[in-house]
């Protein structure tokens, strides 16, 4: 009897350890960057989520550039995005007298954050700017069609542009909506069959049979909807 009790206790401990590993937050870089940008006040000028800049009186373009579309007019690559954040200007723009004059006419100007965010924070911010801007865009025609479809279905409303964000989700196991390009996706979707189950039913058969997983899925604020009749 004592052996059985010890065995049961061991199984319980192993189960708790396994679930603790699954429950450990694993935010993708773009989401870490979004949260850092929010904490740092970036959206005060670049607008909600950085996609709609506020008015900037005195400038010919009238507004602070947003990350969605406008960003590639000012930053051609990741290094230039880093320069904007770290130095408040790219090396290319800094050498332009006309650009400096235009900047000085504006009421608002990009601050130079220097080393405030560290290399990891800087990389996370770059990841978020790219996600908000839709970079890199898919090159494969099937991937392009899929991206257009998930935008049409509203999937990006919770998962963010390209499925790369992880917005807060109170009540869920990890406290956020899982992204499609992070570690969470592999834990939730093991194969194509499970992907279809999530899409059709809002839950996989594996998770539906697990009372612990079902408990957290049911108490989450936004839950994955069933799209059986709309995804085709």
Write out the residue ranges for each language-model feature.
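Short, solvent-exposed loop/helix junctions and linker helices
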Residues: 39, 74-75, 116-119, 152, ...
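C-terminal capping alpha-helices of c-type cytochrome domains
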Residues: 19-21, 26, 84, 109-138, ...
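N-terminal export/targeting leaders of redox proteins
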Residues: 1-35
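An amphipathic alpha-helix signature
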Residues: 78-86, 90, 119-130, 189-200, ...
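Periplasmic/extracellular electron-transfer cofactor-ligation site
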Residues: 34, 38-63, 89-102, 134-135, ...
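Conserved beta-strand positions that form and line the central face of beta-propeller blades
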Residues: 66, 109-112, 179
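Structured beta->alpha junctions
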Residues: 71-73, 114, 184
């Amino acid at each position: 009897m004592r052996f059985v009790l010890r065995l049961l206790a061991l199984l319980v401990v192993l189960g708790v350890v396994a679930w603790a590993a699954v429950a450990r937050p694993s935010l993708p870089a773009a989401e870490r960057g979004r949260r850092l940008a929010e904490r740092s006040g970036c959206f005060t000028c670049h607008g909600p989520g950085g996609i709609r800049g506020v008015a900037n009186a005195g400038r010919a373009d009238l507004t602070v550039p947003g990350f969605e579309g406008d960003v590639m007019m000012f930053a051609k690559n990741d290094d230039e995005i880093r320069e904007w954040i770290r130095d408040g200007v790219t090396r290319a723009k800094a050498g332009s007298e006309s650009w400096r004059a235009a900047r000085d006419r504006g009421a608002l100007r990009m601050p130079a954050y220097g080393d405030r965010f560290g290399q990891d924070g800087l990389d996370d911010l770059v990841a978020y700017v790219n996600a908000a801007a839709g970079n890199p865009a898919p090159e494969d025609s099937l991937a392009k069609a899929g991206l257009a479809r998930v935008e049409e279905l509203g999937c990006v409303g919770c998962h963010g542009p390209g499925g790369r964000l992880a917005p807060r989700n109170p009540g869920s196991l990890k406290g956020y909506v899982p992204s499609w390009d992070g570690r969470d996706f592999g834990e939730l979707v093991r194969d194509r069959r499970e992907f279809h189950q999530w899409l059709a039913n809002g839950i996989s058969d594996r998770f539906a049979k697990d009372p612990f997983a079902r408990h957290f899925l049911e108490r989450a604020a936004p839950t994955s909807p069933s799209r059986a009749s709309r995804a085709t």
